[in-house]
Amino acid sequence: MTEVKFMPPAAKFLKKLKDKKLKTLYQEAIDKIREDHTIGEAKNGDLAGLYGYDIYYNKTNYELAYKVEYVDNKVIIVVMADTRENFYDELKRYMKG
């Protein structure tokens, strides 16, 4: 099975999630991405090489940003997870830093 690693911003957000339903939706999204990494929307420009996956819950749009790396096997790296508000600005800042 494809390995999944979490960068600090994603790990922190997912660890702080208290809502069990939302946490389950994120886990289901990660499982879907693990099966087919092209399921997310490929980003371009400053975010080329990343994919974005939308999660809708309780009238709020949540995002999951990830990239795929090949070492010995395919590894999916979850870069960031959060609400849609300012998500891509934060993601760009993190990727540049």
Each predicted region: which residue ranges?
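Conserved catalytic core of Hanks-type protein kinase domains
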Residues: 16, 32-33, 81
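A short, surface-exposed loop/turn module that caps and links secondary-structure elements
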Residues: 31-58
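Arg/Lys-rich, positively charged N-terminal/basic patches that mediate binding to nucleic acids
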Residues: 1-29
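Enriched for short, Lys/Arg-rich terminal
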Residues: 57-63, 67-97
